[in-house]
């Protein structure tokens, strides 16, 4: 069949299937045939002396019409060569694109083929698109190996847009489906635009591939260089003998581990041994080597084998507590009881987990001696004291340790404390346990449950170490300011010992016996170089500090010592004498001063007693009546609970007025037809308005102030009171009684009214100097209060 016969289409042609490529017209392509279907199609074409239609397959080895594309190339067989392996090689030259319009036969494949004719494109648009395409191909050729110089020259010199497209598509690597889409596209303008876009994508892809290859080659070169340098360094170290350093370290670690073996859990021994073996195998230049070495040294620093051999001795503990602390009789007594039990358990070889399970928690205001009591215990037992501050702690890993997968991982504070103490049975103070925070990082109180529980703490697991540590020999003492903030499960496992405020007398003795000698020593002064008389000490306590403890008092003593030291050196004198007359030369002006009772009885002004975080205080409550409609106004930064107490008090007073238990003078009555309390607005004020105040204990104080203004009777100025009130006039118990009565004593109050339940329950805890110098009266109802207060 001659090429001129290509015009006699549609025509029936044998169909040969090509698995690998899309063939294009005007190209000579070798095709290898090794299956019977293609062999039969080839034989049919040769037999009929006809052209052959070559179609690409959709699926590998697809030989049915539904497994091949319906388009392909019409061409002739230029040569047929049998191969030794049984295959046949032919050279195929394509002439035109065609598509299957009718299936004639399946064995062999034969179909009616129709020519694919592309649209005609001429003019400037064709020239412009060809120029852009040729430029893109040139750019792609510069960064890839797709185009040979001859092919690139053919494309640059060509003018047949359709043929140039076929040459490019035959050269670049594209998927069969993409090639098919180009093959059947007859709009030449659209084909050029689409091909330009394809070449642009290929350019970008090749740039990225080239960049990645360059980086990979650069990295490989760097790695090879590092390896070469490390090998050189290793040989140098070997010549210098430094290569043996690691071997010495490994031997030292193994020796230390064997010495500690019988004192640690089996899992601890296995884990440390495993890490030593890993460290021995790993190259010292490996980044993991330093992490493993840090772990080994940390684990071996834990003092498994070191334990204080000092036996528990209750007499030593008692002696030390009394030597270091004045007063605090109840806390000291309870601590002595705790260690008496531990001593018996130890002597009779009873495991603590089988005995009394108690964790002591010392609570009270700042500066009252919570931590110093624990310090005295550690001295008596000859054990190290480790303080772990829990204030603001919200990450459980701070206690349990960080897993070694994290950068900067370290053991928890408990483990660090043992390492710092250099003994496995120190005294650990868990300071400010009431200030733990719960967050998304976990609940530290849950970890503390495990640490403090005798049934669990013998196998406490630190995440960093990944083995168990025995904490059963550690003495834990917790401290807190407000036990209501401690989580309930943790609170349930503790026994609380309250350290309440010091009285002025106790502070006087503490300052004279402990603070002044201690600060003199710290400031390099001798006892005969500074003199402070008793009256001055009392003045400093009452007017220069205001706290439950003695921390600020110590600061004042330190200030006196500093200024005395300066005075001794500058003025060349032998002794500094501080008294009430020259005290203001050494300390600033008075900061605190409890308002003394002035002895003037007034209507509507009552002395209340309040509790604050720094001790007790005398709180004035003032009330006035103004013509109005029975409204109640409250000022003085009062909290919700205190406001409710005022409303309860007002309602209770109304009932007493209606019942005739509070007599109203005629001069106060505005309209006999209207209740007197509906004729006035009541304004209650608590001075020092910038300070927030709250709580129910001012109930009887507010009630007395209202009763005073309606009865027009004065309130005794030397009487103070505290107690909650209910609507029936019953006086209910309150808290903080000791601090409140101490404040009343400081203010020269002669009589204090307190709820009867507090009188029966708490009076024994009130210092004798307060009880002996002030009349303390128990009240049951508000009628009792009026009996002792109104003049």
From Swiss-Prot:
Enzyme class, spelled out: hydrolase
Q: Which domain of life is it from?
A: Bacteria
Entry's Gene3D superfamilies?
1.10.8.60, 1.20.5.5270, 1.20.58.1480, 3.30.230.10, LON domain-like (2.30.130.40), P-loop containing nucleotide triphosphate hydrolases (3.40.50.300)
What keywords is this UniProt entry annotated with?
Answer: ATP-binding, Cytoplasm, Hydrolase, Nucleotide-binding, Protease, Serine protease, Stress response
Pfam family of the protein (one): Lon_lid
Q: What induces it?
A: By heat shock.
| Compartment(s) | Cytoplasm
**Active site per database record:** 697, 740
The biological processes this protein is annotated with in GO are:
cellular response to heat; protein quality control for misfolded or incompletely synthesized proteins
Q: Which reaction does it catalyse?
A: Hydrolysis of proteins in presence of ATP
All copies of the Lon N-terminal domain together span: 13-203
Residues forming coiled coils: none
Q: Return the EC number.
A: 3.4.21.53
A single Gene Ontology CC term: cytoplasm
Residues forming the Lon proteolytic domain are 600-791
State where ATP binds: 364-371
Q: Name one GO molecular function term.
A: ATP binding
Protein family (similarity comment): Belongs to the peptidase S16 family.
Q: Which NCBIfam families match?
A: lon
Q: Which HAMAP family match?
A: lon_bact
Function field:
ATP-dependent serine protease that mediates the selective degradation of mutant and abnormal proteins as well as certain short-lived regulatory proteins. Required for cellular homeostasis and for survival from DNA damage and developmental changes induced by stress. Degrades polypeptides processively to yield small peptide fragments that are 5 to 10 amino acids long. Binds to DNA in a double-stranded, site-specific manner.
| Subunit relationships | Homohexamer. Organized in a ring with a central cavity.
Q: What is the designated name of this protein?
A: Lon protease
From which source organism is this entry? Campylobacter jejuni subsp. jejuni serotype O:2 (strain ATCC 700819 / NCTC 11168)
């Amino acid at each position: 069949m001659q090429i001129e016969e290509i015009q006699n289409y549609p025509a029936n042609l044998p169909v040969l299937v090509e698995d690998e490529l899309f063939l294009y017209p005007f190209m000579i392509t070798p095709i290898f045939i090794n299956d019977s279907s293609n062999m039969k199609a080839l034989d049919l074409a040769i037999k009929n002396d006809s052209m052959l239609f070559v179609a690409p397959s959709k699926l590998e080895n697809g030989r049915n019409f539904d497994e091949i594309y319906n388009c392909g190339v019409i061409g002739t067989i230029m040569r047929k060569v049998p191969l030794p392996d049984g295959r046949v090689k032919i050279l195929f030259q394509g002439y035109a694109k065609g598509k299957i319009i009718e299936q004639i036969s399946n064995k062999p494949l034969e179909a009616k083929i129709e020519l694919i004719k592309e649209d005609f494109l001429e003019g400037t648009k064709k020239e412009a698109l060809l120029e852009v395409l040729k430029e893109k191909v040139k750019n792609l050729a510069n960064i890839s190996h797709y185009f040979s110089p001859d092919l690139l020259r053919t494309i640059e010199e060509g003018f047949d847009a359709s043929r140039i497209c076929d040459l490019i598509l035959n050269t670049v690597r594209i998927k069969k489906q993409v090639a098919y889409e180009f093959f059947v596209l007859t709009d030449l303008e659209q084909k050029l635009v689409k091909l330009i876009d394809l070449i642009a994508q290929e350019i970008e892809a090749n740039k990225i591939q080239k960049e990645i290859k360059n980086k990979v080659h650069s990295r490989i070169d760097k790695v090879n260089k590092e390896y070469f340098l490390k090998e050189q360094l290793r040989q140098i170290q070997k010549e210098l003998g430094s290569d043996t350093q690691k071997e010495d370290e490994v031997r030292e670690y193994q020796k230390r581990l064997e010495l500690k073996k019988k004192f640690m859990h089996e899992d601890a021994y296995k884990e440390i041994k495993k890490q030593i073996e890993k460290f021995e195998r790993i190259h010292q230049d490996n980044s993991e080597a330093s992490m493993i070495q840090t772990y080994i040294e940390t684990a071996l620093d834990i003092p498994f084998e070191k334990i204080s051999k000092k036996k528990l001795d209750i007499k030593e503990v008692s002696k030390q507590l009394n030597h270091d602390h004045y007063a605090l009789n109840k806390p000291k007594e309870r601590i002595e009881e705790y260690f008496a039990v531990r001593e018996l358990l130890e002597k009779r070889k009873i495991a603590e987990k089988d005995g009394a399970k108690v964790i002591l928690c010392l609570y009270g205001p700042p500066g009252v001696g919570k931590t110093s009591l624990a310090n005295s215990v550690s001295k008596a037992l000859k054990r190290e004291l480790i303080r772990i501050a829990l204030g603001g702690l919200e990450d459980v890993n701070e206690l349990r340790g960080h897993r070694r997968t994290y950068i900067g991982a370290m053991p928890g504070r408990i483990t660090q404390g043992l390492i710092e103490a250099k003994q496995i049975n120190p005294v650990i103070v868990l300071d400010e346990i009431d200030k733990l925070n719960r967050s998304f990082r976990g609940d530290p109180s849950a970890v503390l449950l495990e640490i403090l529980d005798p049934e669990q703490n013998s196998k406490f697991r630190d995440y960093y170490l990944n083995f168990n540590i025995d904490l059963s020999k550690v003495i834990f003492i917790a401290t807190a300011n407000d036990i209501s903030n401690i989580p309930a499960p943790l609170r349930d496992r503790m026994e609380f010992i309250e350290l309440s405020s010091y009285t002025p007398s106790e502070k006087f003795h503490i300052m004279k016996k402990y603070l002044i000698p201690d600060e003199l020593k710290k400031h390099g002064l001798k006892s005969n170089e500074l003199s402070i008389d008793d009256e001055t000490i009392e003045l400093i306590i009452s007017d220069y500090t205001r706290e439950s403890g003695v921390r600020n008092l110590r600061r004042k003593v330190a200030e006196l010592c500093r200024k005395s030291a300066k005075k001794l050196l500058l003025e060349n004198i032998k002794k500094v004498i501080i008294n009430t007359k020259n005290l203001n030369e050494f300390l600033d002006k008075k900061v605190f001063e409890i308002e003394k009772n002035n002895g003037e009885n007034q209507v509507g002004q009552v002395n209340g007693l309040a509790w604050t975080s720094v001790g007790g205080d005398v709180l004035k409550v003032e009330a006035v009546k103004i013509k109005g409609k029975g409204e109640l106004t409250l000022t003085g930064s009062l909290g919700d609970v205190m406001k409710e107490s005022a409303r309860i008090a007002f309602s209770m007073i109304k009932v007493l007025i209606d019942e005739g238990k509070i007599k109203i003078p005629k001069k106060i009555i505005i309209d006999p037809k209207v209740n007197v309390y509906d004729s006035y607005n009541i304004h209650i004020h608590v001075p020092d308005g910038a300070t927030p105040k709250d709580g129910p204990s001012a109930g009887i104080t507010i009630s007395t102030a209202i009763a005073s203004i309606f009865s027009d009777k004065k309130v005794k100025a030397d009487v103070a009171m505290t107690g909650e009130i209910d609507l029936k006039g019953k006086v209910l118990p309150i808290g903080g009684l000791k601090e409140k009565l101490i404040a009343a004593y400081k203010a020269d109050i002669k009589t204090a009214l307190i709820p009867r339940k507090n009188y029966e329950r708490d009076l024994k805890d009130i210092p004798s100097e307060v009880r002996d110098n002030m009349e303390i009266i128990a009240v049951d109802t508000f009628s009792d209060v009026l009996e002792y207060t109104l003049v």
